[in-house]
Regions:
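Glycosyltransferase donor-sugar binding loop
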Residues: 42, 176, 206, 233-246, ...
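Nucleotide-activated donor-binding/catalytic signature segment of Leloir-type glycosyltransferases, i.e.
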Residues: 246-263
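Short His-centered aromatic/hydrophobic patch
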Residues: 91-96, 115
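Conserved donor-binding/catalytic core segment of Leloir-type glycosyltransferases
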Residues: 197-213, 219-222, 235
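Carbohydrate-associated surface elements
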Residues: 156, 175
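Membrane-proximal helix-turn-helix segments that form the acceptor-binding/catalytic region
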Residues: 132-149
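Short alpha-helical donor nucleotide-sugar binding micro-motif in glycosyltransferases
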Residues: 270-275
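Aromatic "clamp/platform" in nucleotide-sugar-dependent glycosyltransferases that forms part
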Residues: 283
Length: 316
C-alpha cells in the first residue's frame, strides 16, 4: 500500500513529530511505501521517504504562514498532485489538512485525519494569541469537511472532536518507543552534567514553552516546594515557541531552575532516567507523550487531573 503522512514539521523536539516518525517506520516495516510530507524537517529519515515543501524561516512568519496556508494555493495544488496514486493520506495537524482536503476533492485519495487536538484559546496570554488560536481552530474545522475517517489519540480528544465538528473517530493511543524509553537506564552522567548533587532531587518537565502548557504555574508551585525542600532542582526542557512567554518564565526563575532549549533526541531517555519525578502543570494535552515516556522509564508523574491525564498518568 502507498501511504502519505502529512505533518507541518518533522523535528525531534515535537511530540507529534515523534509520533509521525514512529508511525512511518512501523508502516515501512510492514513493507508499505511511505512518504512523509512536511513544511520543515531536521532529522534524516530511515526506512521512509521525506518530501520537504518549505516555509519561512522566521518564527513569526512561520506562524502566520501556517495559519493562512490555504492562501498558498500553488503549493497545496502541487503537493496534492504528488498524492495521486496514493492509497491513503494521513494528516496529523493543521495546516497540512488542506493538502489532504484538496487531494481528496481533486483525485479522490482517501483522507484520514489524525486528531492531536488544538489547545483551548483561553489558555493563551494575550488578545493576539487568543485570536490566533480561534482562527487556527476555525480554519482547521473547515479543512475537515471531506475526511473519510478520523483517529483520536485519546478518549478526551475523541469527545472534543465530536463536540467541535460532529466527526466520529476511533481512539488509537500514541505508541512509545519501548526500545528507547524503558526502565533500567542510567542517568548518572546527565546528573553530573547538570551539576546535580547526590543529596539533591531533580524534577523534570519536557515540552514546548507555550502558555497552554502552564509552565508559569509550575514555577510557582516549584517555589512552594523549594521552601520546604531546598535541595530540589527543576529542569525544563523545551523549545520557546512564544518568545515573550519564555522571557516571562526566565524572569520568574531562580538558580534552582535549569532551562535547556534543546536536548539531542538520543539523550532524552537518559534525562528521564536522571530525574526523581516528572512534573507538569499543563491544562491541556491531547495525550502528553513526555508523561508517558517518563512512566515507561519507571518515573512517577505528577499532573493535574484534567484533559487526557486520567487516561495517560498511571504511575502518579
Amino acid at each position: 500500500m502507498k501511504i502519505a503522512i502529512l505533518t507541518p514539521t518533522l523535528h525531534y523536539f515535537s511530540g507529534i513529530d515523534r509520533v509521525v516518525e514512529l508511525q512511518a517506520k512501523e508502516y515501512a516495516k510492514k513493507h508499505h511505501q511511505v512518504t512523509v510530507f512536511a513544511l520543515e524537517s531536521t532529522p534524516r529519515p530511515k526506512g521512509f521517504k521525506l518530501d520537504v515543501l518549505g516555509m519561512p524561516k522566521s518564527l513569526l512568519l512561520q506562524r502566520l504562514y501556517r495559519l493562512l496556508f490555504f492562501l498558498d494555493f500553488k503549493k497545496i495544488k502541487n503537493a496534492a498532485e504528488k498524492l495521486q496514486g496514493y492509497d491513503v493520506v494521513i494528516s496529523h495537524f493543521y495546516p497540512m489538512n488542506w493538502i489532504a482536503y484538496y487531494a481528496k476533492k481533486k483525485y479522490n485519495v482517501k483522507y484520514v485525519y489524525y486528531n492531536h487536538g488544538i489547545g483551548y484559546n483561553y489558555l493563551f496570554s494575550n488578545i493576539f494569541e487568543v485570536l490566533y488560536m480561534k482562527l487556527f481552530a476555525f480554519f482547521n474545522k473547515l479543512s475537515l469537511k471531506n475526511v473519510d475517517s478520523a483517529v483520536s489519540i485519546s478518549k478526551f480528544m475523541q469527545k472534543e472532536l465530536k463536540k467541535e465538528t460532529r466527526l466520529e473517530s476511533k481512539v488509537v493511543y500514541n505508541k512509545i518507543d519501548k526500545k528507547r524509553f524503558k526502565k533500567g537506564i542510567d542517568g548518572t552522567k546527565i546528573r553530573k552534567k547538570l551539576g546535580i548533587k547526590n543529596n539533591e532531587k531533580l524534577l523534570l518537565f519536557v515540552g514546548r514553552l507555550s502558555p497552554h502548557k502552564n509552565v508559569h504555574t509550575l514555577l510557582r508551585i516549584f517555589d512552594l516546594v523549594n521552601e520546604k525542600l531546598p535541595n530540589t532542582k527543576l529542569l525544563i526542557i523545551g523549545k520557546p515557541t512564544f518568545p515573550n512567554y519564555y522571557k516571562k518564565l526566565k524572569n520568574m526563575s531562580d538558580k534552582n531552575v535549569i532551562f535547556k532549549e534543546f536536548v539531542n533526541d538520543k539523550e532524552l531517555p537518559y534525562y528521564y532516567a536522571a530525574c526523581d519525578l516528572y512534573v507538569t502543570a499543563s491544562l491541556w494535552e491531547g495525550f502528553n507523550l513526555p508523561a508517558a515516556e517518563a512512566q515507561a522509564c519507571g518515573k512517577r508523574v505528577v499532573a493535574f487531573d484534567v484533559c487526557s491525564h486520567p487516561e495517560i498518568v498511571k504511575n502518579g
